[in-house]
């Protein structure tokens, strides 16, 4: 039967060639669009998880209630003990602390006087601990446009738009002005290790990255963390597994009335991710459905 159909197509090209070409092109378009949409979603989930949310996230209840403000005065104290419990109960997950905060970055001239100042948003991650995957997770090696990644305490990475606007170069000494978790003024000097470009306007406009040990000294947050991120094995987000871990952890804390007790969320709970991914999946389905109807 198959041989008969092939002979018919070859011998009568005027009738068979156009349908074959149309169907072939249609299948290619469907496969391409499906792969494109899937790739875009995977990239969005990966970027959001690595920089903003994690696959899982632990914070205090008070912090979670005002999470958008990143209120470090409501941060998780005794984060080392909490992480020990997390590693013990969910050993397959890579747990790592993060701190988000803002301040002013002061750039001096050759005489040590202030040449320029600009507001920055800082993210502190565990970049120097042995075995930490944070530098790779944030893609720092690929993002470096000048200088090098953080290799020792007292170093900082500056986003490219900020660096170009204020003339910051690798090797420069800068001063960060901010406030401690208790509201007191604080400042610290850092050496600019490198300039980074992430290809994301929000990150590139005025972001800095430093090691979490330096941030804890600056913010007077010894053994504290604003948030603890959790990443599932293989850095691959699995909604059902993440939901199971979240439910298990929150069940353990259900009888604790303290507003500073830890609470866990997962990626789909954050920043309208569930609605965004659901909408995108629906759009992808309808696009493919329309193409299939048009080709039938």
Predicted regions and their residues:
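Structural beta->alpha junctions
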Residues: 66-67, 197-199, 230-239, 267-270
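N-terminal Sec/SRP start-transfer signal
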Residues: 1-32, 50
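A short beta-strand structural signal in non-transmembrane regions
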Residues: 56, 162-163, 224-246, 262
